[in-house]
Design a protein with these regions (language model features):
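Single conserved hydrophobic/aromatic residue that forms the stacking wall/gate
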Residues: 1-9
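Conserved FAD/dinucleotide-binding core of flavoprotein oxidoreductases
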Residues: 154-206, 226-239, 251-257
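Predominantly flavin-linked oxidoreductase catalytic cores and closely associated redox partners
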Residues: 37-188, 245
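Long, low-complexity C-terminal extensions of enzymes
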Residues: 250-406
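FAD-binding beta-loop-beta segment adjacent to the flavin cofactor pocket
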Residues: 204-222, 228
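A short, glycine/Asx- and small/polar-enriched loop/turn
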Residues: 80-86, 214-218, 290-291
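Extended, composition-driven regions rather than compact fold-specific motifs
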Residues: 20, 46, 156-157, 168-169, ...
């Protein structure tokens, strides 16, 4: 019986064994049914939204809540005698005074970097990618299938993303300039696109992977790109923004400088920990690769490019599964299940030191795998085609797809 269970699991991919989603996405199914309540459904799912329209939405609800919107371009900053930022001077001569500032100025880091001098800790020794090419590829016909997942494909010096939206696909190639010229990168992207993309010109992006260890200085906190950046991973950036805002809301005590300085130290320690753990999680995608065909993948697997803490965890995970004690919950953006998916989805082998006897949950796991297989069959019959589901919501909202994807 035990041998049969092992053979059954070996015949399945990790994703197929532990999730219902694997079979559903390959069948082109959407994550919910038209009659399900908004923002919920039988499958976990995320959104690709129009960033410009979402920004307009946030602007409108903020103004309705009493926020004053001032539109302008920052020219310089004015410092107070104690070193705090006293005001922003705009290019049109206006002065915007404030008691506390959030630096959302992106890569330029106008306040936290250029004014207050917080340096950027580079992660280039661990995470090699520093450039990207991106473009939008329209569908051939309006009713073309919409892939219900993001497709990431390993390339010689990086990876391509391929995101299916209502009217188009968003496609790009993120790569390491140390391992690939810009010309070779564009050639790789064009091979991926095929003839459909021959007339399209990709947009080139350059970035430095890293983060600021002091994201809160005085009366200023960096948020978003001014705090740090890891590849084109918008969802990770949004999670970090939310985590920072929640901490600021809890930590900030008005009119108490000593409490504010203590809060800044706590905030910087916690956010630095989060960024460090994200470095480990991202590096995990690369360092356990079995590819050895290009210098990019060989360098990624070189122990010299793997943070020591991650090396220590991998050494243990080769003899036991990840434990909740490997993770400091308050510092984690990615929790243990995320590590399971990367490790075992990429074929990482854990040879249990004492076999299954040491792990009393092994039998329950096999029973759970059987329940997953049964649920897969039911879900395939219950969930609609992804394009049909999107068309349903566009019709319900009275909005044409072209209005909601750019």
């Amino acid at each position: 019986d035990r041998r049969q269970r092992q053979m059954c699991i070996r015949d399945s991919s990790w994703a197929d064994a532990v999730t219902v989603q694997e079979r559903l996405i390959r069948a082109g199914r959407g994550p919910k049914r038209p009659g399900d309540p908004d923002f919920s459904g039988p499958m976990n799912y995320a959104y690709h939204f129009d960033a410009a329209r979402f920004a307009d939405y946030l602007r409108d609800i903020s103004i309705a809540a009493g926020v004053t919107r001032i539109e302008g371009t920052v020219a310089t900053t004015e410092r107070a005698p104690d070193g705090d930022i006293a005001a922003l001077m705009l290019t049109d001569g206006r002065r915007v005074a404030g008691g506390f500032f959030l630096d959302c100025s992106g890569f330029s880091a106008l306040l936290i970097g250029k004014t207050l001098g917080a340096g950027l800790t580079s992660c280039a020794d661990y995470l090699f990618n520093d450039r990207a090419l991106a473009l939008q590829l329209p569908y051939d016909c309006p009713d073309a299938p919409v892939r219900p997942y993001t497709l990431a494909t390993a390339q010689d010096a990086g990876w391509t993303w391929d995101i299916g939206l209502s009217e188009r696909r968003g496609i790009g190639y993120v790569y390491s300039s140390r391992h690939c010229s810009d010309e070779d990168a564009e050639a790789t992207l064009r091979r991926y696109l095929g003839p459909q993309g021959a007339a399209l010109a990709p947009r080139a992006l350059r970035f430095e992977t890293g983060y600021r260890e002091t994201q809160w200085i005085g009366n200023c906190v960096a948020l978003g790109l001014s705090a740090g950046f890891f590849e084109p991973l918008e969802s990770t950036g949004i999670m970090l923004i939310e985590a920072a805002l929640k901490m600021i809301g809890d930590f900030l005590v008005p009119a108490d400088r000593s409490a504010r300085e203590a809060a800044a130290r706590s905030f910087n320690r916690l956010m630095t920990g989060r960024f460090e753990r994200i470095v480990h999680f991202l590096k995990l995608h690369y360092c356990i690769t079995r590819r050895t065909d290009t210098a990019y993948w060989r360098d990624n697997a070189d122990p010299a490019s793997i943070p020591q803490d991650l090396q220590d965890m991998l050494a243990q995970w080769r003899r036991r599964p990840p434990s909740r004690f490997d993770f400091v919950v308050d510092l984690e953006t990615f929790l243990p299940p995320s590590y399971h998916y990367i490790l075992y989805g990429m074929g990482f082998e854990t040879r249990l030191a004492a076999g299954e006897r040491r792990y009393p949950g092994a039998r329950e796991a096999h029973e759970a795998f059987a329940r997953v297989r049964a649920a897969q069959t039911g879900a395939l019959g219950a969930l609609p085609d992804h394009r049909s589901l999107l068309n349903h919501y566009h019709a319900r909202m009275g909005t044409a797809p072209a209005k909601v994807s750019r």
